[in-house]
Amino acid sequence: MDFRKHLLKILLLLFGLQLSAYAQEFSTAGFYQTDPKVREAINFNVGWRFIKQDVEGAEAIDFDDSNWKVVNLPDGMELLPLNASGGVNYQGPSWYRKHFTPNEQLKGKKVMIHFEGIMGKSKIWINGQLVRENFGSYYPIHVDLSDYLKFGEENVIAVRPDNSNDHSYPPGKPQETLDFTYFGGIYRDVWLITHNDVYVTHPLAVDKVAGGGVFVHFDDLTEESVKVFVDVDIANEGKAKDLQVHLSLKDKAGNEVAKLKEKVNISSDDSEQVKMSFTVKNPKLWSPNHPHLHQLYVTIKDKKGNVLDTFRNRVGIRTIELKGPEGLFLNGKKYPKLLGANRHQDFAHIGHALPNNLHYRDALKLRQVGMNVIRSAHYIQDPAFMDACDELGMFLVAAIPGWQYWNKKEPIFQERMLKDVRNMVRLERNRPSILLWEVVPNETHFPEEYAIKATQFTKEEYPYPGKYTVTDARTHRSKAQKYFDVLYANDQVEAHKQKSIFKREWGDFVDNWVDHNSVSRVAKQWGEAPQVKQAMHYFKEEWMEDGELQEWPSMTMIYGASESLFGATLWHSFDHQRGYHPDPFWGGIMDAYRQPKFSYYLFKSLLPTSGLEDVPHVDAEPFVYIAHLMTPFSPKDVVVFTNCDEVKLTMYGEEIGIKKSTDPNSPVPRVPVVFTDVFKKIDARNKNKKGYGKIDQKWVEGAVMKAEGIIDGEVVTEHSRWPAGRKRRLLLKVDDMGITPQADGSDITTVVAYLVDAGGAIKRLSDEYVRFTVEGEGELIGGVNNEINPQKLLWGEAVALVKSSTNPGKVKVRAEVLKDGINAPSFAEIEFNTVGPKHQLHYTELPQKEQEYIPTPLLVNESEEMKKLRVELQEVKKQLQEYKLNEVGKQQDTFIE
């Protein structure tokens, strides 16, 4: 443990300071902006008119949309209850329209609009002219607007998304029979990209095999040097030109480690793919624990030296090799098994419409529990999440859309599926995080013809070492297995002993017993016993059947498998919504708000205690966590999760014992520490009936349960529990993970309210309703109609989603119980700040703030004197409440005696 780093954190917190925030970055249409005068990415998310229905003629430039709602993107068309499974979301056409006046300075430039994702099939018009029709929900749409724009006057972009069921494009399966939800809308970012008529193309805007944009790959990698190959596709829409292509590669510290210049002549209205290569000496290599990213600067100049295009890409120098029974080799060296989870992108209430910071926090929350591989179930993820995986050192299994469906009747379905294969590789080929290409629809009976073409197209798009395709290793696909590099299975496959194995989904215990009941599927509010059961199931699940011992795919099974199985992903990281089933999937180690369950700490026990200094926001520190609440309904056994060597458990000041967190009979590096039959509710009652609420040292020593984490014989961390007492107050936490909210009109910050006792213990068994209000440069998402505000406490928690305005500044969040009273818990307030966006926002109008409910005691027009008197009265009421509560406590003590 780095004690100096830990001490610095404590000192900074004591003096009200913060550690300097790591500046995470998000790509824009596949690049990072350097000089906006040459190539600029303009944030086009703010100020779209929207209506959730079909409207005839809404593509026309003069259509009257004045009564439509104004929204900011990403937008999912609607807000939904926490439990939104079973197809409760809207399916059908909707419309978005944006009015804008292009800057006169853009005359003569190329102007592209880049949609990161529109759900379903969609049509896009500019000034009444149809410019693109698209079929598919998860890939960018890159459209040239240059010839359609009118400068000096208002322009209108109209978009008609339609998320209705449609068998003709992937995933193809109707939502009501699908194990995830479509949701809808323009649910990812939109960018306006401007550059000159000589420019580096976008790989999805040009149909070039292994071409378009920038393509980087590596060869001859050692610790001493690596050969870097860079292909740059340049378009020239002007006169023939002699050009210079400049490359500069810089390391994390900004040191230039290589540079290169190449001359090329491109004819008028033509393009050229320029192939370049150079050697980097003593390269900083990318790996999960050391995710070094280099900056590749690409600059196009004319023969006079004028810059015509410039931007940068992030490059992670690494090679992967899968050697079947020998396992995974990263940068030429054997690498340990990878362990992680699948990820669906939907979030509580907002569906798929997550802003970039929420995507980043998703990746960060998983990385902070030690995960180093993610499977993108069952579609390609938002670029912000992919950027985070590159940055945080998380391998990724990239998947095309699909789930248990193949359209045999319409050939267009396979054509579009194969187009998705090419698009996925073109889009993500440069990412160091990409581990496998899942180019088949999940759990689907696809024809052999498709297997041949899908693997062939992948090889064509990535014709270099390090490309690995993957499919299921099931009997009905035995003919197709030979075409793929990797198989999904529990362990080595007898018929394919030389193939590498990956476990795509493990942990979920589905046998269709009474319609998908499973020990893995636990809603957090069900309590500690179900949560403990879920965690222990994920660790190891065995049972007897017909006289034979059966083992379900678990953490124990994964670590105990042969070297052929080089990685595995849990189903699933977060609770998420489903189409065909009315219950959400509750098997996540975190809920839909990304708040942890006990199983979260099972995974965190695999986090090392040092060695992650190069991973942003991730501290490899010792921890210990007691998965027990000391309630009258708590189990007798006490389970503790830790990444320390040993755990010492003390109860009521008496030592229970010391146990190791390792087991010579278990292949898992850390095991749950279980102290059996040590908790008795009568002891908790007797030890706490007097003096409770003082929270002084004497009481703490005599009343709590304490776990101490031990490394090399010394206590390095601890965690305490006590029986939660009377509800005293609400407590608020801004769950920003150290990622500063952006004032871009789209960012969402999670604020969690906890109901706690006098000492801060959370009252997990409470179910009051909590009402949130927001002041300043933010707005509360949702209200009564969508069951968001007020909100019932679940497991002692209520969560507010706060959307940033377009002005940087202070945001104040207040939480209070719905019904006031002399003995009601005290309200809570917390503040946080937003910072200005990194890109220019282009808009002409803003959404109106939703009308918030004003609590009765808060008078809208009250004077400063009245406000002062009201505050004083509240303080008097609070003191009176404390007095009464203490008197009640004394009476109870007397009665017990």
Predicted regions and their residues:
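Non-catalytic, glycine-rich low-complexity segments
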Residues: E25-K52, N67-N103, H114-E116, A158-K239, ...
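Accessory beta-strand-rich segments of carbohydrate-active enzymes
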Residues: F26, G30-D35, D54, Q91-D207, ...
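Substrate-binding clefts and catalytic carboxylate motifs of secreted carbohydrate-active enzymes
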Residues: R39-E59, E78, I118, L178-G185, ...
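Active-site-adjacent substrate/metal-binding segments within catalytic domains
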Residues: D75-F115, M119-N127, R132-F135, D166, ...
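Short glycine/proline/serine/threonine-rich loop/turn segments at secondary-structure transition edges
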Residues: L106-K109, L149-E154, A240, V280-L293, ...
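Extended acidic/polar, glycine-enriched regions
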Residues: K150-E154, D231-K323, F832
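Beta-strand-rich structural segments
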Residues: V230-D233, T299-I300, V638-T642, D747-R764, ...
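Substrate-binding/catalytic cleft of secreted carbohydrate-active enzymes
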Residues: R361-K365, V373-Y601, D619-A627
